[in-house]
């Protein structure tokens, strides 16, 4: 998930969003989660780096991901922190061996 903050230069807004993301670790179905910011790599035509904060989660199954979507902690995150972002892009990936 990639978030573009309404105020991308605001360290306070970035910290608040990360604080909100940390609450999502309390969702039992989330097996693993990390968040980050754009890497300081050399510019390349294929790199998108204008976003503010990202988070990646792993779930054991699609059913667990579905349960996460309606979980009260996720719903509270959206309600309490969505005012911080102007855009969100989600890339759902199913990993198969």
Model region roles, listed by residue range:
Residues 1-56, 60-67, 94-97:
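Short S/T/G/P-rich N-terminal loop/turn motif that feeds into the first structured element of a domain
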Residues 9, 25-28, 72, 81, ...:
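Sec/Tat-exported extracytoplasmic proteins
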Residues 80-97:
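Charge-dense polyanion-binding interfaces
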Residues 62-82:
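C-terminal structural segments of small proteins and small subunits
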């Amino acid at each position: 998930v990639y978030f573009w903050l309404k105020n991308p230069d605001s360290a306070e807004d970035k910290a608040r969003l990360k604080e909100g993301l940390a609450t999502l670790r309390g969702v039992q179905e989330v097996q693993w989660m990390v968040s980050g910011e754009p890497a300081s790599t050399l510019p390349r035509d294929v790199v998108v780096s204008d976003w503010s904060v990202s988070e990646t989660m792993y779930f054991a199954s699609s059913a667990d991901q579905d349960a996460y979507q309606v979980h009260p902690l996720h719903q509270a995150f959206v309600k309490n922190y969505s005012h911080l972002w102007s855009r969100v892009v989600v890339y759902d990936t199913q990993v198969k061996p």
